[in-house]
A protein has these predicted regions:
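Membrane-embedded alpha-helical modules
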Residues: 92-206, 210, 330-442
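Loop-to-helix transition at the N-terminal end of transmembrane alpha-helices
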Residues: 43-62
Length: 442
């Protein structure tokens, strides 16, 4: 095992990788509850989506670990599932079967451009300082997600965002968990993020026994054997509906391609920066294999009946406790497969109050990449700042990346350095502009 995953070379060991994999899984476990709820709004069966989500995440994560040796787990992505349910099925009126067809086709296209090296070429064309901004931006983004999920911040019609209800016991639990986790990190406690999550969950369960509502609880039955994949294979039956209007079909498939491509790119770049997978030329090690795992996961997930499977930025939680190899991803994958049986226990104990502190602390760690940006150079300062701020304000990793690329290209033109812009970056800038112009085109 040590030779296969190169544990010694990566400065890790089996125990650390197992803990990291479990930590990543716990940080991602919310998707097992959220994804079925979101896709149910498109008319899909919750139980079926839960099963498809768990199995596809397990298989894709294990594939990632074995083929790419990356500590990055995969599952049905947030954001892209909302695109599936509320835009493709809601606003555009497609059935969920047709939407699954679009996911399946986008996955096939991903496999082709991953095998041919096109995806790697695009990622490697991103300027190094933009990669740092993307990594830091994702850190701010997941910290924002953690704060929102915990209820520490809430939406406000007057100020957009405001402080949450600090008298809510679940909000207080998340705050206590955050402070505990920060203290553990400062004290250099091994697996501090994971330990913080466990302590938070235990405190919540105890408070639940004392009668406080909304706390993590222990279920009556820890194991379930109620399985049914109602949507399996539906991606094939929806193809004719999808292509009834070829232009709309193109828009739908392109939307899935765009969101998954750059969410994945951002995640891999961010984690690659953290663990030294990016060389002096700014190239990502084993990029083809990691991107192929993402593409295969999407195809497999579509066949089972779930939205696009993508690399999860929450994998940085596992990296934060020492995960450095594919054994971390394999461990997370096994946990997802076991989750098929342990759904009652997982959904009742791993609440937002438990995962939020981990997301916030890891966000703090990832934000440190900002120090690598040359803030005296207005080109990178502007592009980096816009990348970070737009990820948060638009609540979208891919939109933040798109804005950063556009600003970077325009800034290079203004500085008289247009010839230094990589051809791939020019092409991406044009695609990003067209992406934002899609509502006007439609």
């Amino acid at each position: 095992m040590e030779k296969f995953f190169k544990l010694n070379e990566k400065g890790s060991n089996v125990k650390t990788e197992l803990i990291a994999g479990l930590t990543t899984f716990l940080a991602m476990a919310y998707i097992l509850g959220v994804n079925p709820a979101v896709l149910a709004d498109a008319g899909m069966d919750k139980a079926s989506v839960f099963l498809a989500t768990a199995i596809s995440a397990g298989v894709a994560s294990i594939f990632q670990g074995l083929v790419a040796n990356y500590p990055v787990a995969l599952a049905s992505g947030m954001g892209v599932n909302a695109l599936f349910a509320y835009t493709i099925c809601g606003q555009m009126g497609f059935s969920w079967a047709a939407a699954l067809s679009a996911v399946f086709i986008s996955g096939i296209i991903f496999i082709l451009i991953s095998v041919t090296g096109v995806r790697k070429a695009i990622i490697n064309a991103i300027p190094v300082q933009l990669k740092l901004a993307i990594g830091a931006g994702i850190g701010f983004f997941i910290a924002f997600v953690g704060l929102k999920n915990a209820g520490i911040i809430v939406a406000s019609p007057s100020t957009f965002v405001t402080i949450g209800n600090l008298t809510d016991p679940t909000v207080l639990l998340a705050i206590v968990g955050l402070l505990i986790t920060i203290a553990l990190v400062i004290k250099n406690v091994p697996a501090a993020v994971f330990v913080g999550m466990v302590i938070t969950a235990v405190i919540g369960i105890i408070l639940g026994f004392m009668g406080m509502a909304g706390m993590p609880t222990l279920p009556e039955h820890f194991i379930s054997f109620d399985f049914e994949l109602q949507a399996a294979g539906s991606c094939f039956s929806g193809i004719s509906e999808l292509f009834a209007n070829p232009f709309q079909a193109f828009v739908v498939i392109f939307s899935f391609l765009f969101v998954d491509f750059f969410d994945t790119a951002g995640t891999l770049v961010a984690i690659g920066n953290r663990i030294g997978l990016i060389n002096d030329k700014g190239e990502l090690e084993n990029a083809e294999q990691a991107l192929l795992a993402d593409a295969v996961g999407t195809v497999f997930g579509a066949v089972l009946g779930t939205s696009t499977v993508t690399s999860f930025v929450e994998s940085s939680s596992g990296v934060g406790v020492g995960g450095r190899t594919g054994l971390t991803a394999c461990t997370s994958g096994v946990c997802f497969l076991l989750a098929v049986f342990l759904s009652p226990l997982i959904l009742s104990t791993v609440t937002n109050a438990v995962t939020a502190p981990a997301l916030i602390v890891v966000g703090i760690m990832m934000a440190q990449q900002l120090k690598g940006i040359d803030w005296d150079d207005m080109i990178f300062a502007a592009a980096g700042f816009v990348t970070v701020i737009m990820m948060i304000l638009m609540y979208s990793i891919s939109n933040g990346i798109a804005c950063g690329f556009i600003v970077y290209t325009i800034a290079m033109i203004a500085a008289g350095k247009a010839k230094e812009v990589h051809p791939t970056v020019w092409a991406l800038m044009i695609i990003f502009v067209l992406y934002f112009a899609t509502p006007y085109i439609m």
